[in-house]
């Protein structure tokens, strides 16, 4: 599934199947990471990794 812009407010949940607290979250196929810096192909992103502001990859994928 391609990333989708859920247009959710910061701190709000979005309709990606799991709770998302990112503004304009990008939902990936695993539906466990909503941040755009967590690519769908990174399996570690479903393990509670976080995204640094301005980063292209989540903390687990660096």
UniProtKB/Swiss-Prot annotation:
Residue numbers spanned by region Beta: 1-30
Residues noted as binding a divalent metal cation 4 in the record, renumbered to the chain: 34-35, 45, 49
Binding site for a divalent metal cation 2: 8, 14, 16, 27
UniProt keyword Amino-acid biosynthesis present: no
A molecular function GO annotation: metal ion binding
Positions of region (Alpha): 31-62
Keywords for this protein: Acetylation, Metal-binding, Metal-thiolate cluster
Domain topic, free-text comment: Class I metallothioneins contain 2 metal-binding domains: four divalent ions are chelated within cluster A of the alpha domain and are coordinated via cysteinyl thiolate bridges to 11 cysteine ligands. Cluster B, the corresponding region within the beta domain, can ligate three divalent ions to 9 cysteines.
Positions with a binding annotation for a divalent metal cation 7: 51, 58, 60-61
Record-linked Gene3D superfamilies: Metallothionein Isoform II
Residues the entry annotates as binding a divalent metal cation 6: 38, 42, 45, 61
GO biological process, one term: cellular response to cadmium ion
Source organism, top-level taxon: Eukaryota
Similarity comment: Belongs to the metallothionein superfamily. Type 1 family.
N-acetylmethionine carried by residues: 1
Residue sites binding a divalent metal cation 5 per the record: 35, 37-38, 51
Pfam families linked: Metallothio
Residues given in the record as a divalent metal cation 1 binding sites: 6, 8, 22, 25
Gene Ontology CC: one annotated term: nucleus
Function (record text): Metallothioneins have a high content of cysteine residues that bind various heavy metals.
Binding positions (a divalent metal cation 3): 16, 20, 25, 30
Name of the featured protein: Metallothionein
